């Protein structure tokens, strides 16, 4: 039913909202939602960013994350997992990473790359040099590794939204 679908007004932030009966009808401004409410579908809309669906079977908690580079950089994944754990979830958490821009399609300038490396020198592993002014960024791997830090079980739907124009919308291609 349409009444059971909840979408967010996505803001490229690190804000996570826990959905409860009291805030279900309100406009949700965030980039992640989690809930224990049964028969509720959570939705995320992307156009190259990474959609992530999360599930804790034991505690019956579901969540979704809109993770573009800004949100991933600002710890949207960490904030979401911590919010789920705050709901008494110390069991196995499962995540599915959906279609997003691929590592060979995400061209960035060196300023972008330096921003990530300044945060952590280890972030160099998510970049490969394209030419003297540009690099390619592996957003999917960056997001995967952020989930792995919390020992989340991860599945991938490996499609490149930029390259697969017949199947997906791409912000960068438009």
What is each residue range found by the language model?
Residues 1-174:
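Active-site microenvironment for binding and transforming phosphate-containing groups
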């Amino acid at each position: 039913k349409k009444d059971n679908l909840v979408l967010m007004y996505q803001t490229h932030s690190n804000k996570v909202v826990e959905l409860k009966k009291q805030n279900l009808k309100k406009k949700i401004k965030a980039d992640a939602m989690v809930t224990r409410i049964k028969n509720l579908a959570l939705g995320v809309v992307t156009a190259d960013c990474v959609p992530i669906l999360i599930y804790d079977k034991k505690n019956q908690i579901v969540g979704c994350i809109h993770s573009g580079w800004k949100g991933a950089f600002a710890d949207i994944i960490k904030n979401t997992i911590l919010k789920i754990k705050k709901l008494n979830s110390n069991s196995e958490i499962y995540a599915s990473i959906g279609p997003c821009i691929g590592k060979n399609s995400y061209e960035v300038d060196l300023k972008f790359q330096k921003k990530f490396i300044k945060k952590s020198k280890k972030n160099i592993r998510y970049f490969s040099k394209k030419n003297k002014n540009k690099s390619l960024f592996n957003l999917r791997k960056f997001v995967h590794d952020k989930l792995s830090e919390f020992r989340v079980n991860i599945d991938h739907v490996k499609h490149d939204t930029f390259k697969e124009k017949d199947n997906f919308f791409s912000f960068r291609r438009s």
